[in-house]
Swiss-Prot record:
Protein name: Pole-localizer protein TmaR
GO cellular component entries: cytosol
NCBIfam families hit by this protein: PRK05423.1 (NF003844), PTS_reg_TmaR (NF040881)
Organism: Enterobacter sp. (strain 638)
Residues passing through the membrane, by range: none
Span of the signal peptide: none
Major site of localization recorded for this protein: cytoplasm
Amino acid sequence: METTKPSFQDVLEFVRLFRRKNKLQREIQDVEKKIRDNQKRVLLLDNLSDYIKPGMSVEAIQGIIASMKTDYEDRVDDYIIKNAELSKERRDISKKLKVIGEIKSSEAKSE
């Protein structure tokens, strides 16, 4: 079975397609994030509508908003902590994989 060497144009086309695929993936993630953000805004407004009743004072409405803000800030803090924990675990796994790769590489060289 004979393997054919890809032409320079084939390599350029492959790189172009791969870069386009990555760009599309980033754009899709960006659009999905915008969708999630706007869905959250709609939900927030729905929640706010549930709490605000006719005849409420401005102070009562401001109290509700302040309470909601505190709740959301607490959630953000929790997500920041969770993200840091996940990042640490990812770094630890990367280090282990690197060590395993180095061991496999040295075993292959000694054979």
